[in-house]
Amino acid sequence: MKLAYWMYAGPAHIGTLRVASSFKNVHGIMHAPLGDDYFNVMRSMLERERNFTPVTASVVDRHVLARGSQEKVVDNITRKDEEENPDLIVLTPTCTSSILQEDLENFVERASLSTQGDVLLADVNHYRVNELQAADRTLDQIVQFYIQKARKNGDLLEEKTAKPSVNIIGVSTLGFHNQHDCTELKRLMADLGIEVNEVIPEGASVHNLKRLPQAWFNLIPYREIGHMSAHYLEKEFGMPFVDITPMGVVETARCIRKIQEVLNAQGADVNYEEYIENQTLHVSQAAWFSRSIDCQNLTGKKAVVYGDNTHAAAMTKILAREMGIHVVWAGTYCKYDQEWFRKEVSEYCDEVLINEDHGAIGDAIARVEPSAIFGTQMERHVGKRLNIPCGVIAAPIHIQDFPIGYKPFLGYEGTNQVADLVYNSFTLGMEDHLLEIFGGHDTKEVITKGISADSDLGWSADGQAELNKIPGFVRGKVKRNTEKFARERNITEITAEVLYAAKEAVGA
């Protein structure tokens, strides 16, 4: 077991609550000690919604530890059922309260005897899985529960819609640009003449889950959430699914061609080639931009990519294939699905990194000194310390990644957003130099280029002054070489003389 003060993917109960609070009229109850109950605050702060987060903490305190939880948990479930009238209540422990080894399944059965709505215990092993795996499993559990319930009641709708239709599975609260992606996917489906049957879990009613089998196919835009549900629906009803993330011009076209293949296999007669060509050449600016002089200035520049599987893989392909940028390494924190990631990106980058230790990722960035980083909020912090620009492409995210304006990452409008993000992330040619000349950023001190906080070197006033005379675009490199030179010779304070000596040593 390892103590972590930064996690890329949160604990399992966060994933369960993300799915529960994405549905309409579903209430989540977490059986948790104080400290594990931060989901409400986090969601209320980040998601730009007017409604309260439908999650209640059933707090594990000293009274519970003395008497057991049954009475309190059952009371909380029945009280919330009376107050909110939810269609479904999802109970989840946290990894901390799981230690108590209580029979929560029994509590749920007891509570459901006196509730109007359904009650479910999240079927998740809190020690074995993280937020993303738990979200996928909880969505699958809820889908299965309501499909089986409809089957039992005899009101399961299995007859296909007259026109081609789709279920979009995996759009959830607190996802990276998920709301905007969903809007863009709906537009894309409308352009292709495909009706959207259901979007789950975001904004969906659990009573509509019985309508899922009516769609012609399922679209899984994100690798992390929705796969288990898609496999279940395929097994039960023979429903095909498309799991190509339409991010970037090439992958969007590949996704549309796969949809065409799936529809034509079911008796439709569609041809989307003209649409793909029109969008690529005339509507999406990304294809034109990648041939422009602006983008050609980026050719061969070094970048690193890190994030969840979906976004890191898609971004690596866009940079390497569509923009000619040299991806030195691509990494993911989704260790549980690393085989897929390796297969997707290995031909587009020099090195594949599977690691969830933010310190190791920071050191890997410092080691290769890229021109730009594409990662999570943590890599943005690393970039600030290293004075390397960073574009955020994946969760974990902060309030600025929930923009008010329309910024999808998927579909053809998404290609424009990604192109902007890439171009704006690289420092423009004369920018640093002009800032130096006109005295911009004059409060900015040159900071260490190591991430691990073990630097034992100091710069004297004359050494710092001499360093500041060096143009910004090479200053970082000179500073690192000088510090390396000083460490090798056990020098603790770097003066102007040490800087000159280091320069000579490198020159020699």
Swiss-Prot record:
<dbReference type="InterPro" id="IPR016209">
    <property type="entry name" value="Protochlorophyllide_Rdtase"/>
</dbReference>
<comment type="function">
    <text>Component of the dark-operative protochlorophyllide reductase (DPOR) that uses Mg-ATP and reduced ferredoxin to reduce ring D of protochlorophyllide (Pchlide) to form chlorophyllide a (Chlide). This reaction is light-independent. The NB-protein (ChlN-ChlB) is the catalytic component of the complex.</text>
</comment>
<keyword id="KW-0067">ATP-binding</keyword>
<dbReference type="InterPro" id="IPR042298">
    <property type="entry name" value="P-CP_red_C"/>
</dbReference>
<comment type="similarity">
    <text>Belongs to the ChlB/BchB/BchZ family.</text>
</comment>
<dbReference type="GO" id="GO:0046872">
    <property type="term" value="F:metal ion binding"/>
</dbReference>
<dbReference type="GO" id="GO:0051539">
    <property type="term" value="F:4 iron, 4 sulfur cluster binding"/>
</dbReference>
<keyword id="KW-0408">Iron</keyword>
<keyword id="KW-0547">Nucleotide-binding</keyword>
<keyword id="KW-0602">Photosynthesis</keyword>
<keyword id="KW-0149">Chlorophyll biosynthesis</keyword>
<feature type="active site" description="Proton donor">
    <location>
        <position position="294"/>
    </location>
</feature>
<feature type="binding site">
    <location>
        <begin position="429"/>
        <end position="430"/>
    </location>
    <ligand>
        <name>substrate</name>
    </ligand>
</feature>
<comment type="pathway">
    <text>Porphyrin-containing compound metabolism; chlorophyll biosynthesis (light-independent).</text>
</comment>
<dbReference type="InterPro" id="IPR050152">
    <property type="entry name" value="ChlB/BchB/BchZ"/>
</dbReference>
<dbReference type="GO" id="GO:0016636">
    <property type="term" value="F:oxidoreductase activity, acting on the CH-CH group of donors, iron-sulfur protein as acceptor"/>
</dbReference>
<comment type="subunit">
    <text>Protochlorophyllide reductase is composed of three subunits; ChlL, ChlN and ChlB. Forms a heterotetramer of two ChlB and two ChlN subunits.</text>
</comment>
<dbReference type="Pfam" id="PF00148">
    <property type="entry name" value="Oxidored_nitro"/>
</dbReference>
<dbReference type="InterPro" id="IPR013580">
    <property type="entry name" value="LI-POR_suB-like_C"/>
</dbReference>
<protein>
    <recommendedName>
        <fullName>Light-independent protochlorophyllide reductase subunit B</fullName>
        <ecNumber>1.3.7.7</ecNumber>
    </recommendedName>
</protein>
<dbReference type="GO" id="GO:0005524">
    <property type="term" value="F:ATP binding"/>
</dbReference>
<keyword id="KW-0479">Metal-binding</keyword>
<dbReference type="InterPro" id="IPR000510">
    <property type="entry name" value="Nase/OxRdtase_comp1"/>
</dbReference>
<keyword id="KW-0411">Iron-sulfur</keyword>
<feature type="binding site">
    <location>
        <position position="36"/>
    </location>
    <ligand>
        <name>[4Fe-4S] cluster</name>
    </ligand>
</feature>
<dbReference type="GO" id="GO:0016730">
    <property type="term" value="F:oxidoreductase activity, acting on iron-sulfur proteins as donors"/>
</dbReference>
<dbReference type="Pfam" id="PF08369">
    <property type="entry name" value="PCP_red"/>
</dbReference>
<dbReference type="InterPro" id="IPR005969">
    <property type="entry name" value="Protochl_reductB"/>
</dbReference>
<keyword id="KW-0560">Oxidoreductase</keyword>
<keyword id="KW-0004">4Fe-4S</keyword>
<dbReference type="GO" id="GO:0036068">
    <property type="term" value="P:light-independent chlorophyll biosynthetic process"/>
</dbReference>
<dbReference type="GO" id="GO:0019685">
    <property type="term" value="P:photosynthesis, dark reaction"/>
</dbReference>
